[in-house]
Design a protein with these regions (language model features):
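Helix N-cap/coil-helix junction residues
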Residues: 67, 202-206, 314
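A conserved helix-loop-beta module that forms one wall/lid of the active-site cleft
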Residues: 198-216
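Glutamine-centric residue-chemistry signal
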Residues: 9, 30, 78, 100, ...
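N-terminal glycine/serine-rich phosphate-binding loop of ATP-dependent small-molecule kinases
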Residues: 1-94, 106, 122, 149, ...
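Residue-level signal for inorganic ion chemistry
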Residues: 23, 46, 73, 101, ...
Length: 320
């Protein structure tokens, strides 16, 4: 029997799920991890705690199934959340700044007033907002001495959660196009980091991971799941679009999770919305076959239920 494993690393919890060839779930395990709120604007995760939750979920599943049946694994992850870690030690230099975090509004205001990069920003498909990775990277550079000194020594990697997990699994610096397209540094047309934006903000290209297609061999795991290849990586909402078989232009999916996200497959076309939708990569398989999407998002959906549970104590479980 051949199985496929999936790491689903979300905003509030992590799952490891094993599927058979028919797509049926064979086994799974889920674990929540800590949320940190330094102030009313900030939301952080401990990257090591994220990794520990992944390891715990995998180990729990491997107690019930034979690892030799798992032929490959994929990664689906919370998007935009940004991690900075040392190339030499592999240790995080600061907590991960989560997509919900709004501390970088003043940085975004400065970017908005910069007329030199308006066309380059347009090529990212995204509005200038605290939601995306660019302002988080700039905040880390400007406010964390360990990041500043590591940047000067060419010893820092800025990555989204997929990059962090790939690094922990096999020691490489890689990301996929869907996650890269959520950074405000990715060119939708060239499918590369936008050099003008990198130069404008003094972000060295070698401080960012290498961009690969969503369906790609990212190498074999060297730690837990040793020898098993990583063959797919997508941001969680794009993974949902793919998982719901929205392969045709015009097909739509909507997900209610921590937030609410509706994505429409636009096929080969890069469509810029006039009504506040985001333009993003849907998925890519092979070097050339890339599909795009437009996205509408609401930051707070299930997060409101968690707030009622954890902050107001009006309920004991989310199911209530």
């Amino acid at each position: 029997m051949e199985y496929f494993g999936a790491i689903d690393q979300g905003t509030t919890s992590t799952r490891f799920i094993v599927f058979d060839n028919s797509g049926k779930i064979v086994e799974q395990h889920q674990e929540e991890f800590n949320q940190y709120f330094p102030d009313e604007y900030s939301v952080e995760h401990d990257p090591q705690e994220i990794w520990i939750s992944v390891v715990n979920c995998i180990e729990a599943v491997l107690k019930k199934i034979d690892i030799n049946h798992i032929s490959s694994i994929g990664i689906s992850n919370q998007r935009e959340t940004t991690v900075a870690w040392s190339k030499s030690t592999g240790n995080p230099l600061y907590n991960a700044i989560v997509w919900q975090d709004t501390r970088t509004q003043s940085i975004c205001d400065d970017i908005s007033n910069n007329n030199n990069i308006k066309e380059d920003i347009k090529r990212t498909g995204l509005p200038i907002a605290t939601y995306f990775s660019l302002s988080k990277i700039l905040w880390l550079i400007n406010n964390v001495p360990e990041v500043q000194s590591s940047l000067e020594k060419d010893d820092v990697i800025f990555g989204t959660v997929d990059s962090w997990l790939i690094y922990k699994l096999n020691g490489t610096f890689q990301t996929d196009v869907t996650n890269a397209s959520r950074t405000l540094l990715f060119d939708l047309h060239s499918l590369k980091w936008n050099e003008n934006l990198l130069n404008e903000f003094n972000i060295p290209s070698n401080s960012l991971p290498i961009i690969k297609p969503s369906l790609h061999n990212y190498g074999e795991c060297k730690s837990i799941l040793e020898g098993i290849p990583i063959t797919a990586v997508l941001g969680d909402q794009q993974a949902s679009l793919f998982g719901q078989h929205c392969f045709k232009k015009g097909e739509v999916k909507n997900t209610y999770g921590t937030g609410c996200f509706a994505l429409t497959n636009t096929g080969d076309d890069i469509i810029y919305s006039k009504n506040g939708l985001l333009t993003t990569v849907a998925y890519q398989y092979g070097e050339r076959n890339v599909k795009y999407a437009v996205e509408g998002s609401v930051a707070i959906a299930g997060a409101a239920v968690q707030w009622l549970r954890d902050n107001l104590n009006l309920i004991e479980t989310s199911e209530q």
